[in-house]
Amino acid sequence: MGYNDDFIRIFSENVTRTGTQQLLDWLGTTDFYTAPASTRFHGACESGLVMHSLNVYNVLMQRYFEDTDNRESFTICALLHDLCKANYYKSGFRNVKNDVTGQWEKVPTFHVQDQFPFGHGEKSVYLIERFLRLKPAEAVAIRWHMGGFDDSVRGGSFTISDAYNEYPLAVKLHLADLEATYLVEKGTSSVNRR
């Protein structure tokens, strides 16, 4: 069973709200199941995005899910937090100098081609809401899952602090995303980082 089969199975088993099938149908028209998760770092490989989404789900459920938490909410947030990356990356090549031979070599790479520049977390929320109605905690968690890496936070916004104080799911999703990215997926890039 591949990543896309696991994704569809987990999503279908845990998410029952109106629009679920329409969202899955739409995902099938995008590159979500084959896209990388980043240009050069974690999951910079074919199917890196769906792999990363499943890793975030597994970390979130294994480390942070409590009896009082909502399984459907956790599933939606983990599996769809990076929906903004569907149809976002393009593959290509770049030249890198070989340290041993001194020759320039063409190596595969990914680059960003953002067709809808709406932000990161907020873009994921927007895309999800085209199909599923999100609960406030879900929308906030997905919006702020990047933590300190979010552009508005780097620009000086303190709203993230209010979000994390009010919505534990937002903190849990951010921590699961960090762990999946930097620990679980370490070494998953097929792209030369130079």
PLM region spans:
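Short intrinsically disordered terminal tails
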Residues: 1, 191-194
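Non-catalytic interface/linker regions that flank or bridge core catalytic/transmembrane domains
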Residues: 1-35
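Amphipathic alpha-helical segments within well-ordered protein domains
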Residues: 8, 12, 57, 61, ...
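Short low-complexity stretches enriched in small and charged residues
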Residues: 12-13, 32-45, 130
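All-alpha helical catalytic cores of prenyl diphosphate-utilizing isoprenoid enzymes
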Residues: 22-29, 42-54
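Divalent metal-dependent catalytic cores for phosphoryl transfer on phosphate-bearing substrates
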Residues: 39-43, 51, 62-192
